[in-house]
Amino acid sequence: MLAALLTLSAVLTAQNRPAIDFWNRRAPGTEYESILEVSGREELGVFLQRARDPRNLRTICEGRLEAIDTAIPTQQQYLKTLLAQPQQSRDFAEIAWTHRSLGQLWAYVGQLGRAAEEFDAAYRIALERQSTDPRLRDALPPLEAMIGVAHLRRGELENCVDNHQAMSCIFPIREQGRHQRTSGSERAMEFFLKHLARQPENLEVRWLLNLAAMTLGRYPDGVPERWRMPAKAFTSEENPGRFDEVAHEAGLHTIGRAGGAAIEDYDGDGRVDIFVSSTDPCASARLYRNAGGGHFEERTEAAGLKEQLGGLNATHTDYNNDGFIDVFVMRGGWEYPMRNSLLRNDGKGN
């Protein structure tokens, strides 16, 4: 059955898992202990069709969507195959790792609750079998950190995105920015403390423990003294002033992924406009025209940007010296190669 499955699609197994440490996402040969990434990028990469034309932005988007549609069901089927083996011949480390890979894939699509469930399943196996398999014993600290990160991100989505308000996720967290839905940060603190009990030298997890407590209004007293960061760690000697979040009122409140921004006067009316790109290969670049009075109106389609998909970064330049500011969009560098774009401005912001 497993052989048939392997002919249908890629499967994340011991033979083809991403070229990183079995449990830790630290690159081989490095000496530092870094926080475990919960993104699923490496895992989804196994399912991406690398042969797609990097010059065709639309087919790259389609390939990513196909990979997402394939990855989770394929891994779930592989897990069923592993669990169908007789109890005495099961590879529990491989079963735990498959739960972990499913958790990463769920994280990739933004389902952090389901991601945490899969990480937790791997963690329970590691706890139960640690005495018989050193791989599972070694898995406990990184899994604890991974579960904590997944829950912290879940809390961020539930409070900073789904329940967004002006003070959401502005660091350091003040009273108005505290989480109203608290289970994410509460569970994160639980697993960060478990991790620190095993690896007290991990400063990144210690930092995240204090951050999680801050989102709940429990810093500093809610953090055990041994792990408590001093208050000066969250303050600055500089005084840059205060910036209020006004994106919603300005017409700029959109939800997307990280990307680039190039702010310039693209239509020559004397007011600066905003061009943004997104690392999501299925999301188009956007152009917001400054309408004056602190308000912006979207002109993405009118500017011919609907098919300008993806973009790690963007910068403005007048490449042809016609006096109109153009935009250069840079892509690729993560999951797959993608072409760049040089967008010529016709002088009307198009």
Segments predicted by a language model, with ranges:
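Hydrophobic beta-strand segments that make up the repeating blades of beta-propeller
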Residues: 261, 271-278, 323, 327-332
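TPR repeat positional signature
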Residues: 92, 99, 144, 151, ...
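Short glycine/acidic-enriched loop and turn motifs that connect beta-strands
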Residues: 280-282, 333-336
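N-terminal leader/linker segments that initiate helical-solenoid repeat arrays
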Residues: 16-89, 93-97, 101, 161, ...
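Blade-edge motifs of beta-propeller repeat domains
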Residues: 221-256, 288-309, 343-350
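Beta-propeller blade termini
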Residues: 250, 258-268, 289, 311-324, ...
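Short coil/linker segments at helix-helix boundaries
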Residues: 61-62, 92, 96-97, 104, ...
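Helix-turn-helix repeat elements of alpha-solenoid scaffolds
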Residues: 63-81, 111-125, 181-189, 237
